[in-house]
Amino acid sequence: MSGSDKLPGLASDAVLKQSIPVPDSFVEIKGIDYSKDSAYNMKAVDLIESMKNMGFQASSVSQACEIINGMRSWRGKHIDSLPEHERTGEFDDEGYQKSTIFMGYTSNLISSGLRDTLRFLVQHKMVSAIVSSAGGIEEDLIKVLAPTYMGEFSLPGKGLRDQGMNRIGNLLVPNDNYCKFEEWIVPILDKCLEEQEEGMKKMGSDGLNADSPACWTPSKLINRLGKEINDESSVLYWAHKNDIPVFCPALTDGSIGDMLFFHTFKASPQQIRLDIVADIRKLNSMSMAASNAGMILLGGGLIKHHICNACLMRNGADYAVYINTGQEFDGSDAGARPDEAISWGKIKAEAKQVKVYADASIVFPLIVAATFASEKPN
């Protein structure tokens, strides 16, 4: 090595490499300047707007809000200008086509306090249809019967089991809650079975079609449970009241599955039957009828794929917002970015789409505050 004080050319070229001229389209990274008066006690809408050029997941959260506002504000043709066969999907109060918004969420989000946010959306008819895992059905009902409590992630499982306490992350659900759930749901299942049997007796030449009183589906049972719970704190109550279908293709995967299993013995030899084929026809038909389709998917797995696959039936959704923490290296559905769904035809190539890598319990209340709840509902 030379003792010269001259900067080595190799190092100089590597460290001081010249950039191309910055394109006019580049946006400068900026955050929130709390030294300005406008930043104090900032509204959610303004906070989200200030996060737009912050980078990382802050920018993705802001983009998610833009996409949700886009699906909410989209308007198509007036119903009077459409031929009869095109008068499908949803229309606003003035008769213009509007987006059909599919919302999916996993059960843990209903177990958490996010349930109240989800209930708000259903209460005010801000979504068109829901897909949930089984826990998202039962936990909503159980919370009417008895509360869920704060715990800690680190509580030992053996001690909790001895105490009859079930842990969901840092939430605690006394096992007595599930006993109360059984006491509440069994008489309802008895009545549903009775109605199904009556429908079977009256079944005519049309056979067992989807409109038959003898045909019970998961969504029909969920609607009935929402009616029977009759409590305004419940998501399912408002779904029933506002005629918003709630689909749960894995309804047996949880406590409600336990109750259905137990009921097959109590009701022997007759057993209630639920038709999942009629439900997939109903969900897919909603998608095909939609003049514009948006997806808001909180979590991954079954709830995410079920909605994405329904949107395949119309050659893809027009808007998509994913919120989950899944990574794509293992090929999981939760980890897949929206671009993977584009390859399958489940999201349109030109769709507005984003994946927010975050815990939905943190970011979704903020997103709702800046979109659906930015103004008081009528």
UniProtKB/Swiss-Prot annotation:
This is Deoxyhypusine synthase. The gene is DYS1. PANTHER family: DEOXYHYPUSINE SYNTHASE. One of its GO terms (cellular component) is cytoplasm. Its cofactor is NAD(+). It comes from Debaryomyces hansenii (strain ATCC 36239 / CBS 767 / BCRC 21394 / JCM 1990 / NBRC 0083 / IGC 2968). Keywords: Hypusine biosynthesis, NAD, Transferase. The active site is at K346. NAD(+) binds at residues 107-111, 133-135, 139, 253, 300, 325-326, 359-360. InterPro entries: Deoxyhypusine_synthase, Deoxyhypusine_synthase_sf, DHS-like_NAD/FAD-binding_dom. The lineage of its organism: Eukaryota, Fungi, Dikarya, Ascomycota, Saccharomycotina.
